[in-house]
Curated annotation (Swiss-Prot):
Signal peptide: none annotated. InterPro entries: Rbsml_uS13_C, Ribosomal_uS13, Ribosomal_uS13-like_H2TH, Ribosomal_uS13_bac-type, Ribosomal_uS13_CS. It comes from the Bacteria. This is Small ribosomal subunit protein uS13. Keywords: Ribonucleoprotein, Ribosomal protein, RNA-binding, rRNA-binding, tRNA-binding. The gene is rpsM. GO terms for cellular component: cytosol; small ribosomal subunit. Located at the top of the head of the 30S subunit, it contacts several helices of the 16S rRNA. In the 70S ribosome it contacts the 23S rRNA (bridge B1a) and protein L5 of the 50S subunit (bridge B1b), connecting the 2 subunits; these bridges are implicated in subunit movement. Contacts the tRNAs in the A and P-sites. Residues 93-124 are annotated as: Disordered.
């Protein structure tokens, strides 16, 4: 496995796809990096030379990835909750943030159902 920016990427995959294993680099970012490094995106990771790996590292060094990106996202969410914005309140309550409905659905964000028992009707 080749190491790029401290992350092991799979050898058997095309370099274009293998770069997406790095948190913060998607397919479009991977294509941009490979274009900067002047490397064929169809090339397999195992076929890359050391010079090509160095070129990829240099091209990708400007991107915020892995720990730095996760930290920035967490700080952004923390800031939203501290200032009491709508999005911050939704984050705090573990509800959908982007305006989705919650009466039905939203199970991923809310977690498993909490069943509420019905009151028994007393007969006279």
């Amino acid at each position: 496995m080749a190491r790029i920016l401290g992350i092991d990427i799979p050898n058997q995959k095309r370099i274009e796809i293998a770069l997406t294993y790095i948190f913060g680099i998607g397919l479009s970012s991977a294509k941009t990096i490979l274009k900067k490094a002047k490397i064929n995106p169809d090339k397999r990771v195992k076929d890359l030379s050391e010079e090509e790996l160095v070129a990829i590292r240099n091209a990708a060094s400007g991107y915020k990835i892995e720990g730095d990106l996760r930290r920035e996202i967490a700080l952004n969410i923390k800031h939203l909750t501290e200032i009491g914005s709508w999005k911050g309140i939704r984050h705090r309550k573990n509800l959908p943030v982007r305006g989705q409905r919650t009466r039905t659905n939203a199970r991923t964000r809310k977690g498993p159902r909490k069943t509420v028992a019905n009151k028994k009707i007393e007969s006279k």
